[in-house]
Every structure is written in structure tokens, then in C-alpha cells.
Amino acid sequence: LFAGNLNAETKTYKMVFVPASEKGDESDYTSLIAITEKLTGFNIDTIKVTDYNAAVEAMRAGRAHIAWYGGKTYVKAAEIANAEAFAAGVRPGEKDAGYYTYFVVKKDSKLKEFKDVKGKILSLNTIGSTSGDLIPQVELNKINLSIKNKDHFNKVFYAGSHDACLLAVLNNQSDVCG
């Protein structure tokens, strides 16, 4: 969680979020909101935005006080919206916050090794997503592939969400989802 523009007089804070699933509502964050309200004593109202840049802009403009960002977006928010980290999500049974990035293909795909993605159609989540854009690009760079190099992929596109990225593979619009 990241905060900006907080003060002691305010009792209701606005939390900006980018939907984490196709449902597209704050139910993805219900537990987080309840815990934050309980621990701080503040009321939390939510603001839904469609992308990470809009979340940062809401905080920069003072329309939001709290946000749930990935690592890449946090760096931007810290620079332009004075965001400060005050909590991190940790999965049950794990010691540290971290990211998992998966490259997904169909079960019957001929892609058996990571290097086989060269020349294929790649779908990613959204621009600015740490787990669905930045980390996949880092992993591709480790095997000397770049989404910016037209010779490396037949096509690269942003599907718009994790769910949409997976659906692109299932619907044969993409060979691999990162």
C-alpha cells in the first residue's frame, strides 16, 4: 500500500485501485480495505480507475490518498505523487513480498522451452504492470529477446488484464501470455 497527502484531520480517505480481475470492482480489495480501516480507524472510500497511470494521477492530483501499486508503478508514484510505501502484500506461508510471472501456453502447444517463444505472438497484461509487463520483459531480455525488436516476435500486444491475456491464448489470438 502506498500513501500520499495524508493528514491527521481527515477521517475518510480515498483509495484508488485498478481492478485485479474481470469483475472490475472493489471486491478484489474488500479484505484489504477492511483491515486498513480496522488498523487505522479511518473510513476508506474507493475510486476505480482503468489503468496504473490514472491511479498515479489520482494521487498526484489529491483525489486519492491511498493506492495499491505494483513495484513499477510505485516508483513512478513516488517520483511524481510523493507516494510512500507503508505496507506490502505477502502471500500466506511466504516470508517476503514478491512477484510471480508466468508465461502461459495452451496444453497442446508446441512451445516446450522458454526460448521457443521467438517468432510467436505474445500477449502481455497492461503497460505499467509489474507482473504482466515489466517482469516478463526482464525475463525475455535474459534470453536475448525484446518486445521492441520486430524480428523477435510475430506480434506483441497488450490484452488489457491478466484474465484477458489468458483468454487471448485460449482463443488462439496469442501463442503465449506473459
Predicted regions and their residues:
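Acidic/His-rich segments in extracytoplasmic proteins that coordinate ligands and/or metal ions
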Residues: 71-77
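Structural recognition of the beta-strand scaffold that forms the well-ordered cores
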Residues: 46-48, 66-68, 87, 123, ...
